[in-house]
Design a protein with these regions (language model features):
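Conserved, structured core segments of small domains
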Residues: 1-108
Length: 108
């Protein structure tokens, strides 16, 4: 699905729309106990994915209900696999991710 930045007739010439994925991943009830020992590995991986351009933005909601990420990927399945591979998922910090296509405004 990620087609890269697109030019559309109704979009100004100095703006492009990039299709990416907005991902919401709820924290489990056990997350406060499990998260600290996994956090270093998780943050190291997220930082690497940001440097590689796969993850655009990532962070947790202040009320500790979920994490929100913007991810570049071709398909929803690819996004969900990326989340499944994270230590927060295998370690019981995250569960039940959802991914939706998202039009990101990119100035040229």
């Amino acid at each position: 699905m990620n087609t890269g930045p697109q030019s559309l007739p109704e979009v100004p010439e100095d703006v492009q729309i990039e299709t990416v994925w907005v991902v919401e991943v709820p924290y489990t009830p056990e997350a406060p106990e499990r998260r600290p020992k996994l956090r270093r590995a998780h943050l190291t991986r997220i930082a690497r994915l940001i440097r590689e351009g796969v993850v655009i933005e990532a962070g947790g909601v202040a009320d500790f209900s979920k994490a929100v990420l913007l991810i570049r990927a071709n398909t929803e399945a690819e996004v969900l696999a990326l989340i499944a591979e994270d230590v927060y998922t295998s370690g019981g910090v995250w569960h039940s991710p959802t991914a939706r296509a998202y039009g990101r405004v990119v100035p040229r």
